[in-house]
Structure formats: structure tokens, C-alpha cells
Amino acid sequence: MHKHRKPTEADVTPESLFYQRRRVLKALGISAAALSLPLSAQADLLAWFKGSDKPKAPPGKPLTFSQPTDWKLDLPLTPEDKVTGYNNFYEFGLDKADPAANAGGLKTDGWTIKIDGDVAKPLTLDIDDLLKRFPLEERIYRFRCVEAWSMVIPWVGFELAKLIKFAEPTSNARYVAFQTLHDPEQMPGQKDRFMGGGLDYPYVEGLRMDEAMNPLALLAVGVYGKTLPPQNGAPIRLVTPWKYGFKNIKSIVHIRLTRERPPCTWNLAAPDEYGFYANVNPHVDHPRWSQATERVIGSGGLLNVERQPTLLFNGYAEQVASLYRGLNLRDNF
């Protein structure tokens, strides 16, 4: 049984990356006092040496969408600047502010997404095709990171199930595999193992078919009523609100239906820490910190922190618990 304690930045950052960063800063002559700063402040010091002339992302374009009452939460939304400024997207850096700082030049014009594998109708659609073919709706979802922090986010998108049905899956299709864009020139973390966390790219994820067909599973193309900014996974990303955030793969270019369980990036990198299912569960701790509570990202700063109990399946048990009936959630984390 793991002791419940408040995670430190060394905890929520993989240990090898945490200490590698400190070695680099020491090699640059950074003082011991500077090394005691939070990782975000240390990143600012590194940025001083690297330069910070990064292109800014264009403003998001307004989207047309419905607002079904079924998907509204009686909870305050996380401020937009926190949703777009506090992100994990290692293709653009390890710190929470790195994606917003480094992803502005991501080119999404003419973006296509390929759907193939065990389907009767393989497809390649561009983002405009998707927006025309599948009506958009706003869904306000809880978002829970495996690092024990949470947000409430108004996504705009359409059900993943609609795209899968359009491709006509065969009876062999038991899983859905996803892949992020692989473009090291645009995504510097893919060519710099320090900047990209030492992960193997492209980033890949997967769901069971019944999970993918659940009405909660969303392909999001927008947030706060506008097209997604690059740091949030433009132009299209997965949102599965009952799972930890690392399952919510960003900047998708390929969806493949398959009979075999697909590989998943974090599960490959650290299988004892990041499971295939990644369902939010307050009773199953991460090996290095508790999942019983979560830090709510709100309008205040780091010193104005609210914690709340974590809900099983992130509060979506009524919609998804039946998917895992008879499954040991501790072993299949």
C-alpha cells in the first residue's frame, strides 16, 4: 500500500528527466539556488540560453456547434488561459508552459487523417471534410491528469463512434489505434531526446473497440468555441474524460482498427506506472504518488490551490462502469 502524500515536481516528472535537467543546468554554471527553483523556472533559465524567438499561433477560428444539455456540468470552467497555457505535449517540451511557447508554428492547413485497418471502407479525410460531415457539439467535461491535477474544459467536437461507423469496421476490429503526427522539424521534442522526454515517437495510443464506441469518447477540434490551439492538440485530438490525460492523444494523423491490442507510448516507456486502460481510479495509486485527491487548476496561482477527492472514472461511472464489469481494475490499471 502506498503512502498518500502530496506529489513534488520530482514525482510528477519521470525521475531520469528530473535529474538530467539538473545536470544540464549545472553544466551551464547555474547556481544551487537556481536549482532549487520549480522546474518551470528552471526551464526559463534554459530558454535564456536557447533563445525564444518562436512563431506565435494564429488566433483560433470561431466554430459553429450545438450545445446539448446532456453534456453540461454544473461546475465552473477552468479559465481559458490555464487550459491553453498549462499543458503536457512532450513533442514541444517537458514543462507545462513549453507547448504554448514552442508549438505556435505547427502547420495544420491541409491536415489529413487516415482511417484504415480492419474496415470495409478505408478513408483519408482532411480536416475540412470532417467538419462538414460530422456536426459539432460542445461538451463540458472533467479532465484529470495522471499527475493528480484536474480541469473542467468546454470541448467542441463529435463522437469518435461516428467516424468509426463511417469507415465500416469489420468483425475483426477489436481495438482502435491512434498515431500523432511525426514531424521532427515541427515538433522539436521528436528529435531532441532531452526536450522530448526520451519517449519513442511518434506518440501512439489505443482503446478497446467498446471504449471507442462509447458516446463519451470525443474527437475534439475546438475548445472555448474556437479551433484548437497547437498546444492543445490542433487540429484534432482524442478526449476520453474517464481516463487519465495521457490517453487523450493529440494532433492525430492516423486511426487504425485492429484485432490486436495496440502499443501505447507511456505504457511502453514505463509499464509499471502507466497502464493500457488508464482509467481514473482514486483507489489505485501511481507508484510514486496518491490518486485519492487532485489539485484543481483554477484562476489562482500556485499558492491558491484547492484539492478535492478524485472520483472513480472521473465522475463518469454511470456511463462507463459497465465496460469493465468483471475486470480487476487494480491489475488492469
From Swiss-Prot:
Places the protein is found: Periplasm
CC per GO annotation: periplasmic space
Family: Belongs to the MsrP family.
Keywords in alphabetical order: Metal-binding, Molybdenum, Oxidoreductase, Periplasm, Signal
E.C. number(s) listed in UniProt: 1.8.5.-
NCBIfam families: PRK05363.1
Cofactor(s) essential for the protein: Mo-molybdopterin
Residues that hold Mo-molybdopterin according to the record: 87, 90-91, 145, 180, 232, 237, 248-250
UniProt signal peptide: 1-43
Post-translational modification: Predicted to be exported by the Tat system. The position of the signal peptide cleavage has not been experimentally proven.
Chief location bin: periplasm
GO BP annotations listed: protein repair
UniProt name for this protein: Protein-methionine-sulfoxide reductase catalytic subunit MsrP
One protein family per Pfam: Oxidored_molyb
Repeat recorded as keyword: no
Catalytic activity: L-methionyl-[protein] + a quinone + H2O = L-methionyl-(S)-S-oxide-[protein] + a quinol; L-methionyl-[protein] + a quinone + H2O = L-methionyl-(R)-S-oxide-[protein] + a quinol
Gene: msrP
GO function terms (MF aspect): metal ion binding; molybdopterin cofactor binding; oxidoreductase activity, acting on a sulfur group of donors, quinone or similar compound as acceptor
Main function: Part of the MsrPQ system that repairs oxidized periplasmic proteins containing methionine sulfoxide residues (Met-O), using respiratory chain electrons. Thus protects these proteins from oxidative-stress damage caused by reactive species of oxygen and chlorine generated by the host defense mechanisms. MsrPQ is essential for the maintenance of envelope integrity under bleach stress, rescuing a wide series of structurally unrelated periplasmic proteins from methionine oxidation.
Free-text cofactor note: Binds 1 Mo-molybdopterin (Mo-MPT) cofactor per subunit.
PANTHER family to which the protein is assigned, alphabetical: PROTEIN-METHIONINE-SULFOXIDE REDUCTASE, PROTEIN-METHIONINE-SULFOXIDE REDUCTASE CATALYTIC SUBUNIT MSRP
